[in-house]
Amino acid sequence: MQWTKVLGLGLGAAALLGLGIILGHFAIPKKANSLAPQDLDLEILETVMGQLDAHRIRENLRELSREPHLASSPRDEDLVQLLLQRWKDPESGLDSAEASTYEVLLSFPSQEQPNVVDIVGPTGGIIHSCHRTEENVTGEQGGPDVVQPYAAYAPSGTPQGLLVYANRGAEEDFKELQTQGIKLEGTIALTRYGGVGRGAKAVNAAKHGVAGVLVYTDPADINDGLSSPDETFPNSWYLPPSGVERGSYYEYFGDPLTPYLPAVPSSFRVDLANVSGFPPIPTQPIGFQDARDLLCNLNGTLAPATWQGALGCHYRLGPGFRPDGDFPADSQVNVSVYNRLELRNSSNVLGIIRGAVEPDRYVLYGNHRDSWVHGAVDPSSGTAVLLELSRVLGTLLKKGTWRPRRSIVFASWGAEEFGLIGSTEFTEEFFNKLQERTVAYINVDISVFANATLRVQGTPPVQSVVFSATKEIRSPGPGDLSIYDNWIRYFNRSSPVYGLVPSLGSLGAGSDYAPFVHFLGISSMDIAYTYDRSKTSARIYPTYHTAFDTFDYVDKFLDPGFSSHQAVARTAGSVILRLSDSFFLPLKVSDYSETLRSFLQAAQQDLGALLEQHSISLGPLVTAVEKFEAEAAALGQRISTLQKGSPDPLQVRMLNDQLMLLERTFLNPRAFPEERYYSHVLWAPRTGSVVTFPGLSNACSRARDTASGSEAWAEVQRQLSIVVTALEGAAATLRPVADL
């Protein structure tokens, strides 16, 4: 891969000129590049905002979603070439662009033997079959390139048994069935999306002896209770009855055969028999029209009120069908899954604008390219924005109008839908370089869920730059509200420092930011426009991962006019320019203090008494948080003082490195040995109920179990020590460089 060579050109030139201050030192004479900015140029920023074109974004989306582009498919590779063509354009291209390929393990349904779900009568004959494909309501849901609904990485098999309803497939749901006296051994469990991850439904089911799992989307969760064809797409934005959510059921992210290693030819590969993280039993998703046939004919006890949905009947638990229903009482459900695993080539595409002053500092902006079917919303709405933003910046670059201070890297990731594979392989291959040099990662996957308001998820240091950007951009629609002012109407919180501000969500593992945050410790954000949650309870846009996620769906229902896409492009563009051109990095580390203080207060209020009973003190944690708060405030004051004068560029460089590297100090690769890739002690998955430091919360939750002994409480103490050490290390990182 050659992107490292490209980014090194500026360094090599500096060395040849005998500038020899430090690697990538930004005190390059202006004669070397008269366009090298010393700080954010507001005129350039205004130009970029004005040139981002909603119509061009719309046409990008039309082309990107014209055909299905499943990862590694011919159309996916066609889009690789489209990106390369755009980024090498002589008038609007970037400094360089290239594709890199990884050989990864993907999962597909058999074309010769499709997956089927049948009801088998008492005599062994098939008396009813679920739909194998989605209804072709617009002419785009059929054809050989539309992959059959399936659960990626679910094993093949043909289990058959009595049907039970297991709500969302959480561990407590299966325990509830056992409490009701239902024998789960050998049954088929019908579950609904939501509550826990896809793969967890199969894992939890298998623990209780279930032989196979079905998963459906309930209209109560996605359609605001609506389910008839005249109320759903193409007549509204709601999911049609035949719609089936596809998805990866792999528990981890990255290529399954090369954990912690890039999937290049020279890498060691795990034997397939030793791969972990796949669903243990056959699993298949179905549409809610088929789920209605099954669920509304179930026998047994009435399901709890919280388990009821919107299929127009009372949900029962089973097992088996009721005697007065549509199927004989002794009928069973057969789930025949014929998925296969294949090694396939999948490509990332990188486009690079080399920094004029600090070419060894990277601002990364990325999105995945692959989709389950047409993928107009997921992910092509993000790729359409990426292409327009890179066009505008590339045009300024080619005209000689602008070159950023720091390098900008645009990325189109491959095989995200199978488990964030492209981005993970990239972070594995360039782990050290990215950790040392990356300023921030900006992710724009689904750029527009709907057109009500901005929604940003991110680590605390990026809050300030997002706020600054959105205060200067007009919100779509009537009126003169800024995106910031509109955002605060929908998502807000009361900050002890700033008062009422928009609320940033935290980053989980739902898109390509995950390896950057959890594995590399890079300050990251995810930007999108979304819906008014007071008007819909949909857990996500209704046609998510179905064949109904098409260009017309976006054009007609989500964002007519594409003004919300344009707003996302402007927000992301402003953030990129602020991060790449500002003399002082606009990352505010003191904003972490609020998060740490809230975590500490939750630990004191909800865990303090319990910990005292086991002679575990929170005193060191209190001290560590206070140290961090003091050092973060002091660093902010030093920066403010320097901004008023004419600081030495090397001094600014050192301060910027402190800002950039803070996130890395929260990494501990041994903190969560059971959680692959999760090293960030503040943002790892939290299974405990207390909203505090995840390792501490999880350990306390396990230790509360009456069966837990001294080892469980020792783990609580270990997790507390891990957090304290991380916070003390973070505070030390923020001190003046000369101070240890």
Curated annotation (Swiss-Prot):
<feature type="glycosylation site" description="N-linked (GlcNAc...) asparagine">
    <location>
        <position position="334"/>
    </location>
</feature>
<feature type="binding site">
    <location>
        <position position="378"/>
    </location>
    <ligand>
        <name>Zn(2+) 1</name>
    </ligand>
</feature>
<feature type="topological domain" description="Extracellular">
    <location>
        <begin position="29"/>
        <end position="740"/>
    </location>
</feature>
<keyword id="KW-0862">Zinc</keyword>
<feature type="glycosylation site" description="N-linked (GlcNAc...) asparagine">
    <location>
        <position position="274"/>
    </location>
</feature>
<keyword id="KW-0812">Transmembrane</keyword>
<keyword id="KW-0645">Protease</keyword>
<dbReference type="GO" id="GO:0043171">
    <property type="term" value="P:peptide catabolic process"/>
</dbReference>
<feature type="binding site">
    <location>
        <position position="545"/>
    </location>
    <ligand>
        <name>Zn(2+) 2</name>
    </ligand>
</feature>
<feature type="glycosylation site" description="N-linked (GlcNAc...) asparagine">
    <location>
        <position position="451"/>
    </location>
</feature>
<feature type="glycosylation site" description="N-linked (GlcNAc...) asparagine">
    <location>
        <position position="492"/>
    </location>
</feature>
<dbReference type="GO" id="GO:0004180">
    <property type="term" value="F:carboxypeptidase activity"/>
</dbReference>
<dbReference type="InterPro" id="IPR007484">
    <property type="entry name" value="Peptidase_M28"/>
</dbReference>
<feature type="binding site">
    <location>
        <position position="445"/>
    </location>
    <ligand>
        <name>Zn(2+) 1</name>
    </ligand>
</feature>
<keyword id="KW-0735">Signal-anchor</keyword>
<feature type="topological domain" description="Cytoplasmic">
    <location>
        <begin position="1"/>
        <end position="6"/>
    </location>
</feature>
<dbReference type="GO" id="GO:0016020">
    <property type="term" value="C:membrane"/>
</dbReference>
<feature type="binding site">
    <location>
        <position position="368"/>
    </location>
    <ligand>
        <name>Zn(2+) 1</name>
    </ligand>
</feature>
<feature type="transmembrane region" description="Helical; Signal-anchor for type II membrane protein">
    <location>
        <begin position="7"/>
        <end position="28"/>
    </location>
</feature>
<keyword id="KW-0106">Calcium</keyword>
<dbReference type="Pfam" id="PF04389">
    <property type="entry name" value="Peptidase_M28"/>
</dbReference>
<feature type="binding site">
    <location>
        <position position="258"/>
    </location>
    <ligand>
        <name>Ca(2+)</name>
    </ligand>
</feature>
<comment type="similarity">
    <text>Belongs to the peptidase M28 family. M28B subfamily.</text>
</comment>
<keyword id="KW-1015">Disulfide bond</keyword>
<feature type="binding site">
    <location>
        <position position="417"/>
    </location>
    <ligand>
        <name>Zn(2+) 2</name>
    </ligand>
</feature>
<dbReference type="InterPro" id="IPR046450">
    <property type="entry name" value="PA_dom_sf"/>
</dbReference>
<comment type="subunit">
    <text>Homodimer.</text>
</comment>
<keyword id="KW-1003">Cell membrane</keyword>
<keyword id="KW-0325">Glycoprotein</keyword>
<dbReference type="GO" id="GO:0042803">
    <property type="term" value="F:protein homodimerization activity"/>
</dbReference>
<keyword id="KW-0472">Membrane</keyword>
<keyword id="KW-0482">Metalloprotease</keyword>
<feature type="binding site">
    <location>
        <position position="261"/>
    </location>
    <ligand>
        <name>Ca(2+)</name>
    </ligand>
</feature>
<feature type="active site" description="Proton donor/acceptor">
    <location>
        <position position="416"/>
    </location>
</feature>
<feature type="glycosylation site" description="N-linked (GlcNAc...) asparagine">
    <location>
        <position position="345"/>
    </location>
</feature>
<keyword id="KW-0479">Metal-binding</keyword>
<keyword id="KW-0031">Aminopeptidase</keyword>
<dbReference type="GO" id="GO:0004177">
    <property type="term" value="F:aminopeptidase activity"/>
</dbReference>
<feature type="disulfide bond">
    <location>
        <begin position="296"/>
        <end position="313"/>
    </location>
</feature>
<keyword id="KW-0378">Hydrolase</keyword>
<feature type="binding site">
    <location>
        <position position="425"/>
    </location>
    <ligand>
        <name>Ca(2+)</name>
    </ligand>
</feature>
<dbReference type="InterPro" id="IPR007365">
    <property type="entry name" value="TFR-like_dimer_dom"/>
</dbReference>
